[in-house]
Amino acid sequence: MPVQAVCPYCGNRIITVTTFVPGALTWLLCTTLFLFGYVLGCCFLAFCIRSLMDVKHSCPVCQRELFYYHRL
């Protein structure tokens, strides 16, 4: 969820841009599903579920990363 902030790099008042990136929880679930014998690539479904991914917040003006939220 984007947040309103003042960018410490460019000084502008911004609403952050959020990007979902695979993190430890995503890889852990993928590995667990693979080890328990899920076939036909079902283990890769973890990469399609945003609530399992980490979130990167960045400034829309200077494109710098402001915060990284780790799910695990």
Swiss-Prot record:
KW Membrane (keyword) present: yes
What UniProt keywords are attached to this protein's entry?
Answer: Membrane, Metal-binding, Zinc
Region entry Membrane-binding amphipathic helix, spans: 22-45
Share an example GO biological-process annotation for this protein. Answer: regulation of cytokine production
Q: Please state every residue range assigned to the domain named LITAF.
A: 1-71
Q: How does it sit in the membrane?
A: Peripheral membrane protein
Identify its protein family.
Belongs to the CDIP1/LITAF family.
Report what the protein is called: LITAF domain-containing protein
For this protein's source organism, the top of the classification is: Eukaryota, Metazoa, Chordata, Craniata, Vertebrata
